[in-house]
A protein has these predicted regions:
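Beta-strand-enriched cores of mature, soluble protein domains
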Residues: 1-125
């Protein structure tokens, strides 16, 4: 079998999202870990290819496992572009940080982004 090197994918900046949220709803500890739900109350989309707003009514569902350093995130919300098109967004993500930084994140305090491993896979409809 011949190995083939794939080319590096080309990435293009589409937009930035500034999402507003309200206080987390603590579900509590379950057999899977600590569950939280963070309501998404709105936001702004700005960028070279898409502008618009984040529609109120979405949420970021979080499962914080083990010793609190690992979080599985599942956010679902709707965005409306400047020309009235609505898109359904479903983000799945993995976040890992030290115990100290994880606690700061859960309390809504700022954390150095370089101290956090964060990978997100957005799905758009």
């Amino acid at each position: 079998m011949n190995a083939q090197t794939l080319p590096m994918p080309a990435l293009k900046h589409v937009c930035d999202l500034a999402v507003t949220i309200s206080a987390p709803v603590e579900v509590g500890v379950t057999p899977m870990g600590l569950r939280r739900m963070i309501p998404i109350t709105g936001g702004v989309i700005s960028g070279p290819l898409i502008q618009g707003r984040v529609v109120s009514g979405g949420a970021d569902h979080q499962l914080i496992v083990a010793d609190g350093t690992t979080a599985h995130l599942d956010a679902r919300y709707v965005v409306e572009t400047h020309d009235g098109v609505r898109l359904y967004v479903h983000n799945t993500a993995l976040r890992f940080a030290s115990k100290e930084d994880s606690l700061r994140i859960m309390q809504g305090q700022p954390v150095d982004p370089n101290a956090v491993y964060f990978r997100c896979q957005p799905h758009l409809e």
